[in-house]
């Protein structure tokens, strides 16, 4: 399997592997014809992580020197597949909401659906690979505000203490991404 071979090479090179599945590219042929690729005619699709990642996880799932960061456009997989996989396999981390879900409500849905099973430390906080360079500060500000909103809700509901929320906030804003990407 190609992903398993890529994981082997990432481990050998000390690199972090990212997987971004679930987009049917250039869905609208007229937009593709008239304007070319990457013009907004991409559509999220369902993704089967459990079966698709099985060969990779059988071989490298418990490898502590490899990090595989999973992103998704299929929000239905957060609680059903991604959180349980990341909670079980040390190699896996969950990337933040991406593309269509890179929005305040999308970020909140992510936290609500993955935290119970995967916890906070099996995610990578917020990272950004946008081509819209000037939007990066605003996007990170939104992510920090949503994470703090989520933590405040947990404190209000007495699910975590205020001191724990104060410890988690800088982890989510900075330290988890730095650690996941070995920076």
Task: For every predicted segment, state its role.
Residues 39-45, 98-103, 138:
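Short, contiguous acidic/charged loop-to-helix segments that flank catalytic cores in large enzymes
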Residues 23, 58-66, 71-73, 82-85, ...:
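Acidic, glycine-enriched catalytic cores built around paired aspartates
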Residues 120-121, 138-183:
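Mid-to-C-terminal alpha-helical segments outside catalytic/metal-binding sites
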Residues 27-36, 78-86, 104-112, 133-149:
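Histidine/acidic-residue-rich catalytic or RNA/ligand-binding cores of hydrolases
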Residues 30-36, 89-93, 123-130, 151, ...:
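Short acidic (Asp/Glu) and glycine-rich catalytic loops that position anionic groups and cofactors
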Residues 18-22, 69-73, 94-98, 120-139:
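Short acidic/histidine-rich active-site segments
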Residues 12-16, 59-64, 88-92, 117-121, ...:
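Secondary-structure transition/capping motifs at alpha-helix termini
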Residues 1-77:
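Divalent metal-binding pocket/active-site signature
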């Amino acid at each position: 399997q190609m992903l398993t071979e890529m994981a082997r090479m990432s481990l050998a090179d000390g690199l972090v592997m990212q997987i971004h599945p679930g987009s049917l590219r250039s869905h609208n042929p007229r937009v593709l014809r008239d304007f070319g690729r990457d013009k907004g005619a991409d559509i999220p699709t369902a993704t089967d992580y459990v079966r698709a990642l099985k060969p990779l996880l059988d071989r490298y799932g418990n490898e502590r020197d490899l990090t595989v960061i999973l992103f998704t456009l299929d929000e239905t997989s957060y609680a059903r597949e991604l959180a349980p996989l990341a909670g079980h396999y040390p190699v896996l981390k969950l990337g933040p909401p991406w593309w269509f879900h890179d929005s305040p409500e999308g970020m909140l849905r992510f936290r609500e659906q993955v935290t119970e099973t995967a916890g906070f430390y099996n995610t990578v906080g917020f990272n950004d690979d946008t081509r819209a360079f000037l939007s990066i500060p605003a996007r990170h500000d939104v992510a920090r505000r949503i994470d703090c909103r989520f933590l405040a809700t947990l404190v209000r509901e007495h699910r975590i203490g205020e001191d724990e929320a104060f410890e988690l906030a800088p982890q989510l804003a900075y330290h988890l991404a730095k650690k996941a990407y070995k920076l």
